[in-house]
């Protein structure tokens, strides 16, 4: 496992639940095509799994 994850928001948050929007805000993803680099921790991986249909992840 690599030490960092590169996470990109590929779908809009419009029409999602409030919990999914909270997860996206927690990841720092506010706009489509925004990319963040975060540490590969179990907490981050769990958040990514909650919104896996909306993001693209590269290790």
Swiss-Prot record:
One of its GO terms (cellular component) is cytosolic large ribosomal subunit. Pfam families: Ribosomal_L30. GO terms for molecular function: structural constituent of ribosome. InterPro entries: Ribo_uL30_ferredoxin-like_sf (IPR036919), Ribosomal_uL30_bac-type (IPR005996), Ribosomal_uL30_ferredoxin-like (IPR016082). Part of the 50S ribosomal subunit. Belongs to the universal ribosomal protein uL30 family. NCBIfam families: rpmD_bact. This is Large ribosomal subunit protein uL30. It comes from Geobacter sulfurreducens (strain ATCC 51573 / DSM 12127 / PCA). The gene is rpmD.
């Amino acid at each position: 496992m690599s030490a960092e994850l590169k996470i990109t928001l590929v779908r809009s948050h419009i029409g999602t639940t409030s919990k999914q929007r909270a997860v996206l805000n927690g990841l720092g993803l506010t706009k489509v095509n925004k990319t963040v680099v975060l540490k590969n921790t179990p907490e981050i991986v769990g958040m990514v799994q909650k919104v896996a249909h909306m993001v693209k992840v590269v290790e």
